[in-house]
A protein has these predicted regions:
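Hydrophobic residues in alpha-helical segments
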Residues: 13, 49, 88, 129-130
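Conserved nucleotide-sugar donor-binding catalytic segment
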Residues: 20-23, 28, 36-117
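Hydrophobic helical membrane-anchoring modules
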Residues: 103-153
Length: 153
């Protein structure tokens, strides 16, 4: 991880009057080998985020003095995504800092690698948290899954 991650993001937040920032991130293997990267492309907007979670949790810095304290949902794998969507719905701006300041370790046995859990939680996210109807929730899971597949190619 970039040693100056926090100071870089906090300085960006001060200069841009931002209360929430996120960055792109590198993906490393269990053996610390660089195997890819996730490059977010812009500030988060609800219409884009609902289709693809491009904010890595470990890249986020939030000013809790300005953004009310929110709790993660009880979802096992989509709890961060649910929070980003909630903040966007409530009118908060999620600002992108175009730098790679974090590495995320991809692990074969992690909870986030369990595809069935992720699909189940994605459906719950759309149906219960976003209040979409059953058909729209299934459609949204398919779109989310397709976008995830494209990101992993």
């Amino acid at each position: 991880m970039e040693k100056k991650k926090l100071s870089v993001q906090i300085n960006f937040m001060k200069k841009n009057f931002s209360n929430f920032t996120f960055t792109s991130y590198n993906i490393i293997s269990e053996n610390d080998k660089h195997i890819g990267k996730r490059n977010a492309i812009k500030d988060a907007e609800y219409k884009d985020m609902i289709k693809s979670n491009y904010i890595g949790l470990s890249t986020v810095v939030i000013n809790l003095k300005k953004i009310k304290k929110f709790k993660f949902s009880n979802l096992k794998t989509q709890e961060d995504f649910a929070l980003w969507l909630l903040l966007l719905r409530r009118g908060y701006k999620l600002n992108y800092l175009n730098q790679f300041l974090t590495s995320w370790r991809k692990s074969k046995n992690s909870l986030s690698s369990n595809i069935f859990q992720k699909i189940s939680d994605a459906f719950k996210l759309y149906y219960l948290h976003e209040n979409k109807n059953f058909i729209i929730s299934i459609y949204s899971v398919l779109i989310l899954s397709f976008n995830k597949l494209i990101k992993n190619l």
